[in-house]
Each structure stands twice: as structure tokens, then as C-alpha cells.
Regions:
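Serine-hydrolase catalytic machinery in alpha/beta-hydrolase-like enzymes
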Residues: 2, 27-138, 236-250
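Short alpha-helix in the alpha/beta-hydrolase fold that links the catalytic acid
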Residues: 80-81, 200-212
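Acidic catalytic loop of the alpha/beta-hydrolase fold
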Residues: 195-205, 231-232
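C-terminal catalytic histidine-bearing segment of alpha/beta-hydrolase fold enzymes
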Residues: 215-275
């Protein structure tokens, strides 16, 4: 998949340590879970001839938001984001689909391996099933958001999943092989860091290319670029900051984070309504 190749090519410039993946298998999810993990309800969703786990937090009957993982998997940071989303305004029901089927990376090499092996078309089907589950279980409207790999999938869902009512994507764009953003059906808001070095995937050039495609689509859209910010700038927990620094990403900008969340809130409130 071209989206994965773009991200992997840029990630090859990051510092790597040999991962235990290649000798002893993945670490269990608990190794990455925060204390907040207990707030989630674990549910199994069936699509076609397979099932997958999702993690749900927030008020029943509230508008829903499907929250898509970074290339690490369903770790503490995507759970932090989902909890935050569930508490915005009058509240949302946030749902994280486990696209990696229980695997979580602890090192960049693991994340590369997992993302390279992702069935991207299958992930789109997981997203569609997640959106449908929320709508069938009390959410009148459902949006999709995602980060890095999940950001690319979020944009793709706005093209390929007709049940999606709104999208907010963070630092990720899909390849034309996965989804042509000029054919978007849902309103899309996207956020990028000015200093993002993931060329062709999340850098300024990719952001501007996405904006041109969204203009051509005719859907409501916004593309925001944050000065002085690099990749994954929304990740602000102590654990995430340590991990970012290990990847050479040393910027911290709480003002940009607050502004992005404010824009997220306004966008989802506009298209999903309030609980």
C-alpha cells in the first residue's frame, strides 16, 4: 500500500533500536495502557466473517466518534485522546477499533512492521462497521478522527464510508491508491505540523495537496498548519513526550494543542450536533 510506503520511507530516517518483536513476540497491551484504561468498555463487533475488538467510552445516545490509532496500535495515547473527546462539550461516545487485533508496538521498528502488514481495505471495513455499530446503538450521527496512520484512514473514510458524517484528521493523508480525497463525501478538517518531516504523507506539501483535492470535492473542509510543530504534536502525555524525544521530535506547543482541540470541537459540534 502506497500510504504505508510513504510513511515507512520517512520513518526510516528516525533512530531505531532493535525490537524484541523479531525474537520474542509483541509486548502485551498492558505494557502501554494508562490508568484510564479501566474507563473503557470492551466490545466485539462482527463484520462479514470476522470479529474485532473495540473500546468504547462516553455517554450512550451521544453523537459518536470513531478514534483511529497511530501506527503504534491501541496504546495509552489513543486512549487518552478518546477519553478527552468523550468529555468535550456535552460529551461524545468515543470508540477505538483495534485495527492490529491486539498487537501494540513499543518501538519504532515494531510500529513499522505492524503498519506494513496492515490490511488497509480491511481497516476501512472495520471503520465502517464501527460507525454502523455506534449508529445502531444510540448515536444519531458519527464522525471519524485519527492520528498519523489513523489520520490517513480518517480521510479515507470520508471518501469511502457513506455513513460517516464528519472527519477530523491529524497529520496523515491517504495515498490515491487507497482513497482519492477529491471524491470526499463527508466534511473534512485536517491538522498538520509545519515542521513535519514525513514527506508525502504529513509534511506541508502533503497538507496543501490534500487541501486542493478537498476543494475539488466540493465538501466543507479546513486544513490547518501549525507553526513550529512537528509530527504527532498532539501527543502531550509524559510517556508520549518521552517517546517523541526518542524519535528526535522535541517540540512542545500546548497552545497549538489547545487550538487544534478547539477547532475539533467546533467542527464536530457543527456536523454531529451536541449530546
Amino acid at each position: 500500500m502506497a500510504t504505508a510506503r510513504l510513511l515507512l520511507r520517512s520513518a526510516s530516517l528516525l533512530p531505531l533500536r532493535r525490537s524484541p518483536l523479531h525474537s520474542s513476540g509483541f509486548q502485551p497491551r498492558a505494557a502501554m495502557a494508562s490508568d484510564a484504561a479501566s474507563q473503557f468498555q470492551k466490545i466485539q463487533i462482527q463484520r462479514e466473517d470476522t470479529t474485532f475488538d473495540v473500546y468504547v467510552v462516553g455517554k450512550e445516545n451521544a453523537p459518536g466518534v470513531v478514534v483511529l490509532q497511530e501506527w503504534w496500535g491501541v496504546d495509552y495515547e489513543v486512549k487518552n485522546h478518546a477519553i478527552h473527546i468523550s468529555q468535550i462539550g456535552d460529551g461524545y461516545r468515543a470508540l477505538i477499533p483495534d485495527l492490529y487485533r491486539g498487537k501494540v508496538a513499543l518501538e519504532v521498528a515494531e510500529a513499522q512492521h505492524l503498519m506494513e502488514g496492515l490490511d488497509w481495505q480491511g481497516a476501512i471495513k472495520d471503520i465502517q462497521a464501527s460507525v454502523k455499530w455506534l449508529k445502531e446503538n444510540g448515536s444519531p450521527k458519527v464522525g471519524v478522527t485519527g492520528y498519523c496512520m489513523g489520520g490517513a484512514l480518517a480521510v479515507a473514510s470520508g471518501v469511502l464510508v457513506p455513513e460517516v458524517d464528519a472527519v477530523v484528521a491529524f497529520y496523515g493523508t491517504p495515498s490515491s491508491e487507497l482513497a482519492d480525497a477529491s471524491k470526499a463525501q463527508a466534511p473534512i478538517q485536517a491538522h498538520f505540523g509545519e515542521l513535519d518531516s514525513f514527506v508525502g504523507f504529513a509534511d506541508v506539501t502533503a497538507a496543501k495537496s490534500l487541501e486542493e483535492k478537498l476543494k475539488a470535492s466540493g465538501v466543507a473542509h479546513e486544513v490547518h498548519i501549525y507553526s513550529g510543530c512537528s509530527h504527532a504534536f498532539m501527543n502531550a502525555s509524559p510517556e508520549a513526550l518521552k517517546r517523541r524525544k526518542g524519535m528526535g521530535l522535541t517540540d512542545e506547543n500546548q497552545g497549538a494543542i489547545d487550538l487544534a482541540w478547539s477547532r475539533f470541537s467546533t467542527w464536530m459540534g457543527r456536523f454531529l450536533g451536541s449530546a
